[in-house]
């Protein structure tokens, strides 16, 4: 049913409008009377539970940052079967992001190009919303992805990130430090070790014991990935999230003119899968066994998720395929994981 809805209705809508429609519907799910039905239909099998970051995740499969920037649909996403939700990216100051249009589908590639620019309502508002969710027993694990406020100079980035961390860490299950979005000028430069060390040290201290992970780009050289893994280990971080979106447009099936018309931005979805898997393997070799590695990028099926777990991922996230697979995506992945494991 959803593929028909996507082909005939959603694919003809502006992608950002379609996203708002879907996320609003998910946000309303818990209060609609259908939430308990959804939970009964989509609850992950207990055999899928994962212990990581000092937490119990009901499934290894969760929602990547970007889908629910302001934590408005967390409970609904949990009721759809996701084991965790990474909200954000949130910045210390509220900001509108880049001008629209800023989200583009590449349907032939099951991919998306975005240049959203960290549009969000700010860390203080997010913290207030999460504070109200903390006591809910039916909530999923909630990570908070923090980034740099666009108006803040790179030289002042540490103080900006620390401000966000202090606001959201008390109400987060873990923090993800986003230094890898291509849509905020100067942000990816923070992945350079001499800049990353003081940033991560300060955020770790501000988090006051809440697990901290750093999210990296797929466009790093292998040696750079290894150096970041070494730094994360040295600083006692909980782990690494890999990867964010890519600037590459190589090997796409979509007409080149369509891709060019979309313009600048990060590409996510199926084309990212090979590099995301490569980076995962590098990280798993470079990090201690106890470090958490969250793999994201090009994940769509249960087989994709299991392949990441087999390659050493602790947890797996997805987002782009949600647009193409619809609201029962997590249920399908979780059921598929159970089937795969029963045949082994």
Curated annotation (Swiss-Prot):
Cofactor binding annotation: Binds 1 FMN per subunit.
Classification via Gene3D superfamilies: Aldolase class I (3.20.20.70)
Keyword Ribonucleoprotein on entry: no
Entry's EC annotation: 1.3.5.2
Record keywords: Cell membrane, Flavoprotein, FMN, Membrane, Oxidoreductase, Pyrimidine biosynthesis
A Pfam family the protein falls into: DHO_dh
GO biological process: 'de novo' pyrimidine nucleobase biosynthetic process; 'de novo' UMP biosynthetic process
Cellular component GO terms, alphabetical: cytoplasm; plasma membrane
Active-site residues from the entry: 181
Top-level enzyme category: oxidoreductase
InterPro entries linked: Aldolase_TIM (IPR013785), DHO_dehydrogenase (IPR050074), Dihydroorotate_DH_1_2 (IPR012135), Dihydroorotate_DH_2 (IPR005719), Dihydroorotate_DH_cat (IPR005720), Dihydroorotate_DH_CS (IPR001295)
Subcellular location(s) per record: Cell membrane
Residues reported to bind substrate: 69, 114-118, 178, 183, 244-245
Catalytic activity annotation: (S)-dihydroorotate + a quinone = orotate + a quinol
Signal peptide (from-to): none
NCBIfam families for the chain: PRK05286.2-1 (NF003648), PRK05286.2-5 (NF003652), pyrD_sub2 (TIGR01036)
Family: Belongs to the dihydroorotate dehydrogenase family. Type 2 subfamily.
Assembly, per entry: Monomer.
Identification of the protein by name: Dihydroorotate dehydrogenase (quinone)
Species per Swiss-Prot/TrEMBL record: Clavibacter michiganensis subsp. michiganensis (strain NCPPB 382)
Gene that produces this protein: pyrD
């Amino acid at each position: 049913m959803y593929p028909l809805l996507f082909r005939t209705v959603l694919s003809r809508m502006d992608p950002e409008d379609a996203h708002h429609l879907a996320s609003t519907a998910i946000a309303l799910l818990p209060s609609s009377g259908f939430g308990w039905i959804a939970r009964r239909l989509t609850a992950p099998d207990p055999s899928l539970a994962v212990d990581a970051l000092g937490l119990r995740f009901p499934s290894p499969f969760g929602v990547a940052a970007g889908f629910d920037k302001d934590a408005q649909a967390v409970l609904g996403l949990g009721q759809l079967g996701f084991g965790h939700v990474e909200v954000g990216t949130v910045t210390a100051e509220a900001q509108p992001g880049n001008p629209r249009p800023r989200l583009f589908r590449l349907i032939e590639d099951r991919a998306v190009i975005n240049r959203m620019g960290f549009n969000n309502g700010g860390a203080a508002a997010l913290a207030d919303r999460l504070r109200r969710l903390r006591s809910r027993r039916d909530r999923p694990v909630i990570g908070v992805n923090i980034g740099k406020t666009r108006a803040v100079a790179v030289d002042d980035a540490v103080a900006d990130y620390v401000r966000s961390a202090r606001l959201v860490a008390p109400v987060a299950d873990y923090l993800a430090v986003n230094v890898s979005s291509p849509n905020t000028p100067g942000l990816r430069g923070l992945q350079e070790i001499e800049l990353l060390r003081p940033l991560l040290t300060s955020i770790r201290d501000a988090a006051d014991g809440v697990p901290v992970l750093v999210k990296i780009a797929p466009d790093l050289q292998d040696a750079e990935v290894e150096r970041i893994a070494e730094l994360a280990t040295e600083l006692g971080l909980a782990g690494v999230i890999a990867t964010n979106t890519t600037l590459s447009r190589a090997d796409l099936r979509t007409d080149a003119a369509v891709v060019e018309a979309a313009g600048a931005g990060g590409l996510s979805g199926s084309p990212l899968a090979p590099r995301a898997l490569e980076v995962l393997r590098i990280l798993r070799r470079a990090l201690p066994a106890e470090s958490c590695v969250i793999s994201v990028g090009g994940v769509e099926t249960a087989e994709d998720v299991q392949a990441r777990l087999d390659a050493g991922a602790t947890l797996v996230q997805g987002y782009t395929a949600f647009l193409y697979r619809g609201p029962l995506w997590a249920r399908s992945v979780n059921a598929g994981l159970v089937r795969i494991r029963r045949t082994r």
